[in-house]
Amino acid sequence: MKKYRLKDIATVEISGVDKKVKESEMTVRLCNFTDVYYNWAITRGKHDSFMTATASQKEISRFLLKKGQVALTKDSETRFDIGIATYIANDFEDVILGYHCALITPDETKALGCYLNAFLRSEMSRKYFANSASGSGQRYTLSVQTIEDMPILLPPIEEQKRIGELFTNIDRKIEINRAINHNLATPDRSLGAEAVHCAAYPTIRFQIRFPSAY
């Protein structure tokens, strides 16, 4: 693997798009902090769940979500809730990134967003962001420089693609299981707890370990 700084392989922009509705602006949907925080990937299927707001044409041009990008949480009440990444899996026509988040656009000749998303969610990256956050007490934040200086380990593009596809396939299966569980009929309580447990899917956890970057 080759070692880079994030700024050497991607651009980083900080969104300041708020949730207000202004008559002079265009209607959009916002991908907000919680959308980034709770999703491995942002897919077209989530479009209708994004809140409606407005934004200027300049904001739309800068923060419109495009396939291959990565969004990152930038500000939060605890240092452990910042630096959480999500992969933008589809192109969107009217969904832009909301404030308290950063938008990372990789140079795809060097790095793929699906791999960056996995790397930024690694234990090593989480420790980097937690230790580099500024603030204390009520609010923690990541500066643009801190995000840009993040050490990144890159394998060849083909290997990045395989790693990204592995995580994407797992995320899809998890989403399918969630949808199945959501649509299951409420169990008859008279059947007892055992019947409820039979309907549950086991939790599968695994980890890819990246060598130390620093």
Predicted regions and their residues:
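Residues that recognize and position ribonucleotide moieties
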Residues: K2, R29, V95, A118, ...
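Short, positively charged
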Residues: C114-T146
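Short, well-ordered beta-strand elements within core beta-sheets of diverse protein domains
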Residues: A53-S56, A102-E108, E148-L154, T168, ...
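Non-catalytic DNA-recognition/assembly elements of restriction-modification systems
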Residues: M1-V17, D149-A195, I204-Y214
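A short beta-sheet element
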Residues: N32-T34, T52-T54, E59-R121
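A short glycine-rich beta-alpha junction/loop motif
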Residues: D94-A102, S134-G164
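Short coil/turn segments at secondary-structure boundaries
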Residues: K19-M26, R44-K46, N131-A133, F206-I208
